[in-house]
Amino acid sequence: MSTVTSNPSDRVLLITGASSGIGAATARHAAAAGWRLVLAARSRERLESLAQELGGPGRAVAAPCDVTDWEAQQRMAQDALAAFSQIDAVFANAGFGGPRGFLSDTPEHWREMVLTNVYGAALTLRATIPALRESRGHLLLTSSVAGRRVLPGSMYSCTKHALTAMGEAARQDLHGSGIRVTLIEPGMTDTPFFDNRPKDALADDDIARAVLFALSQPPHVDVNEILIRPTAQQG
């Protein structure tokens, strides 16, 4: 059985939702810290461009994946192991939002949101936990401040409450395995989610630094949650 080492250059981080936003920022910060990377998202072109930017084969590989597709998630995990023989950390980050108001969005968009944000994250866990057991690794999930407070009429908030529960459910289920579980809960962040940049929002890099902080802890330290708000955000 492999074990977690203190040297990031020997370790492999798999990121879903890696082609833009928080995922891409985290990939860049992790690469700078020496991690090898498996980059997963739907956009092959953007993934391959990012993988090349971060060192190409041997340092970063693209693993195109629709997280709502179980077979695609299995291939993603298999591709990661084929490339690097191990997975030491997984950042289940794929997700998106939508307008508030139960009459303001379409049922089709709701369905895609629930499948991506909740079902997709659950499939990522299922696909990668066997490898994380081998490495005694680290599982991180992107939830949100919206998963801690209720946003009126927000299906996005509903999905993030589910992610908050999923993180704790996974932590308890994996107790004793050596796998650490961290829930990342950003507040208002300037991501592709917004058409216009929110004033005083966090940057993707702010969230990426929080992820790297959790990953930098020694194996006996399990940072369960990191909730990050911009100083201008009250709720």
Regions found by a protein language model. Name each.
Residues I179, L183-I184, R197-G235:
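C-terminal helical subdomain
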Residues S19-S20:
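Conserved glycine-rich cofactor-binding loop
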